Amino acid sequence: MALPRLTHLQFLVIAELSRGSARGRHLRGCLEEAGVRQSGPAFYQMMAGLEDAEYVSGWYEQQIVDGQIIRERHYKVLAGGKRAWRESRDFYLRVIGVPRPGLAYGA
């Protein structure tokens, strides 16, 4: 049984992105709600790794707030990220002895 390719933090991020694209700030908030304390640079370094692995795609969106141009990073999950997430989920389900979702017991 091969180990999962995703870390626990990457697993959480891809799970959130499976709901739809999101801003980096939103994803950091989700990690905080899960009890993860991570600096901004560490978060964006992790996201760059997910982009390099072609698990997520990132882009900047620009808006003007109080006369200032603000660029925010947005992300969406790619097919490779969904596959890596499912493989990680299935790994942990096997470890605890739970059948994979969608399969009949004993299949």
Model-derived features with residue positions:
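Short coil/turn motifs at beta-sheet boundaries
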Residues: 6, 68-70
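Short, hydrophobic-biased segments on the C-terminal half of alpha helices
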Residues: 44-48
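Beta-hairpin "wing" of winged helix-turn-helix
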Residues: 53-68
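Amphipathic alpha-helical dimerization/coiled-coil segments
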Residues: 80-107
